[in-house]
Amino acid sequence: MMGKGFLDCESLVALQEMALHPIDLTASGCLSEERIQKNSLSAEGFTYSYATERVDDRCLEALQGLTEERELIKQMECMQQGAIMNRIEGFQSESRPVLHTATRAWVRDQDLHEEAAAIARHSKEEALRLAEFLYIARAKFSTLVQMGIGGSELGPKAMYFAMQGSCPSDKRIFFVSNIDPDNAAEVLREIDLEQTLVVVVSKSGTTLEPAANEELFRQAYQNKGLSIAEHFVAVTSQGSPMDDKSRYLEVFHLWDSIGGRFSATSMVGGVVLGFAFGYEAFIEFLQGAAAIDAHALTPKMRENLPLLSAMLGVWNRNLLGYPTTAVIPYSTGLKYFTAHLQQCGMESNGKSISREGKEISFRTSPIIWGDVGTNCQHSFFQSLHQGTDIVPVEFIGFLHNQRGLDCVLSGSSSSQKLFANLVAQSLALAQGRDNANSNKRFKGNRPSSILVAQQLSPRIAGSLLAFYEHKFAFQGFCWGINSFDQEGVSLGKELATQIIGIMSGNAPVEFSEARGMLRLFNVLT
């Protein structure tokens, strides 16, 4: 199903030769209007510009060839139809399908195979139950606290703030994720418990962080003499320890084939987004994601937004050797989006073992980081322009703000100034500027792309979420790694359990290294 191995692809050999002398973006006339128009793609409400990437037609043709040799579209089709994509062949692994796309497939007409169709059907059933629940809950409660960690917090939180500016709401939303009790204490100080719905999210029903925070909140409700069962909602898998209607006002379900970092379009995001903005806004969000799911099956790379972005990322990472990628949204609504992308990209593709269980000898996921523009222009952009490391930048922008507030100063509005800064940074990174004063010299040839929509609406938020989900999936397919497990988080959790045992006096085994550390910090005597 994966075609040739990544390093065996003929297209990769051609790309390696091209990478020795990539296009010079600083050359006079390089960024002509013809190049800018040609190296762009408009689809599904977005315009994507990659004229400031160090690629030319020959390079793009070779990248298209690489997508064909690695059968990336076929792999995407298999994933969306329910093939077993989460596995390591010949080794014990989760061996599951990957069906986050099915959680929104029901909002559009799509022929699905049995496994995917079942998840789509169950997702629709859960959504209809959610609509009934919200009718009562939104009338009764003014506040919602979501408890979860990783994908149970990062995606829903990013999408809540992305939609907040375009969806008027009188609801107050808080997120509690860290096991640090100060996180819970901060939120408890801000809320009226009687008016608050607490949503606890854990697929397994045993995740340490939400379990600990749920206990803190249950104690707070008990101390106030309030009915716990009338204020707590669970989102978990069927049959988990949390799947207990006697302990919760309502229980919503998700499935093993829905990974945490891909779960925002399931009830993991549905309850909080539906409560905050209404059921219709949640459906619009799903429709945006579903539109990109269909678009991601477009065969030609230069007509497929997430595939094109993925392959430009492969070019920057594997051929030009850049170790990090900055994602810079010029939108306050996306202030938590990069944190979600860090998990979605790095937990998916931060792997060094192939799907055949073999050590790989090439680079996989770059470090993903970033912040909101224009703020970050005044913090780390100095390094982007003149630092010793070249960092590809993915700019995200909108032609109109969400809330409608604006003013004109010195002949231009704040929204115009914001967008002008986005374009200026991309051009400055690409073109640079020569100067006899070496301290004022900008070398240029620092690649970037720009993804622009009219406005950050619920539909565009869903599309943006799915765009990056599929970008990272395509990259994992290209590299031949399993983008859908996260074994890297398990070792630290196992050791933490042992250390907790030492600290509580119930250590089952000797762990001299941990004891030494604990004594150093005066935790043990």
Swiss-Prot record:
Record-annotated active site: E347 (proton donor), H378, K493
GO CC field: cytosol
The protein's Enzyme Commission number: 5.3.1.9
Gene Ontology biological-process annotations: gluconeogenesis; glucose 6-phosphate metabolic process; glycolytic process
Cited SUPFAM superfamilies: SIS domain (SSF53697)
UniProt-listed NCBIfam families: PRK14095.1
HAMAP family linked to this entry: G6P_isomerase
Protein name, per record: Glucose-6-phosphate isomerase
Species: Chlamydia trachomatis serovar D (strain ATCC VR-885 / DSM 19411 / UW-3/Cx)
Name of encoding gene: pgi
